[in-house]
Each structure stands twice: as C-alpha cells, then as structure tokens.
Amino acid sequence: MIEISCASIQSVGKGNAKLIEFQYKREKENILISLKTDSTQIGTFHRIATIIYALKMDIISGELSTVIEQGNEYTIDSFILQADGGDTTKVAFQLGMMMDSVFSKNAKFEEILEKLQIQEPAVATFFKETPEFIFSDLPEKNRTCLYLESSAGRGLLYYVSRILMQNQINILSATIETDMETGRAKDSFYLTDGSGQMFASTDLALKIRREILAPIQSNSR
C-alpha cells in the first residue's frame, strides 16, 4: 500500500515486509529529501544514488546512517539535491515513486537499470585535479573511514558507490559535503568489508582506489 501526499510517500508491504518512508520539500532552488527504509544490504546507497543521477539531480550534501529501532535495522538518509532545471516538485515526486519501485522486494535492480538507460558520467573530470583518497581504520568503532576529496559533479557518488558495491563494501554511515566556493566534494564514508571487518591496511583498499582512478590512469597512457 502506498500513501501519497504533496510532501511524502510511505509504502509498507505485507508478507515480505518492506518499509519506505520518503519525504521531500523545496529548499530555495534545491530539494531536501529524507528516506527511511528497512533495506540495509550492501548496495542500498548505490540504488539511491542511481535514481538521483538518472533523474538528472546531483547530491550536494547529505547524511547517511544505519540505526536499530526495536531490534530492527533501518537505513536513514537525508540529502540536499540540485536539480538540472525543470519542475523541482515534479522531479521530487517522481524520485519518491521510483524509490518505491527500487526497494520493492520483487524488483530486479538490473531490469530497472535497463529501463533507465543511464549514460556514464564524465568520470575523468572528477579526478583530474589532485584527488585525495585516505583510508583509515577506526578500531574503537570497527569500521574504516574513506575520506574522498575531488572535483564535484553530477554522477560522482553514483560512480563511487557502484565500485564500493562491486567490492562488497557496506556503507554504515557517511557525510557528503560540497564546497560551493571551490567546487570540491569532501565526503567521508564509514565502511566495513563483506565480512564486517576493517580493511584500510589490506589489498582491498588499494584495489578500490585503483578502480576508482582507472579512468584517468587509462587516459594518461
């Protein structure tokens, strides 16, 4: 069942239960959205970033978190989005409806991707000006922090989150920031590997860095 008002979408399934709470409002020329879902598996943020990118929006700031309420685990995210022209209210509503489809228990993400016909972002432009990738383990929290600083642009988080997902990296929380004066993205991701362990000092961190930077490395040959 889906309940829709001018500012929120809520979907609660039966049997194979699913929960999606989506709210949005205009914030000057931007859109502020919040999302709560019981989908917490690896790749959850990539699904969100994919839909945002497909609708020609860019995440300029945001917070990602994983919480436990009454013994159940939830993903709670909030973002400020910059829309690429058009009717921002209409785009935000469309975003909410697509989120419901993406997180449906019966949805196949690959089929949704085919329908969206997403074009790859110009990845090389993100990393041409001294990108920073700093992996550091936080033993007291049993997680790895990835600090990423690069040129900002639509599709950056879609691209980075896809590589993290492909390497079975779980995003437990994150802070997304854009310095509007310098045009630099300054993002911090708190991660574990597929086994729930830290990995900053392992070959996996080097592999992720290498894969993220692959487009500019191939262009330099």
Tell what function each PLM region has.
Residues M1-R221:
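Regulatory modules associated with amino-acid/nitrogen control
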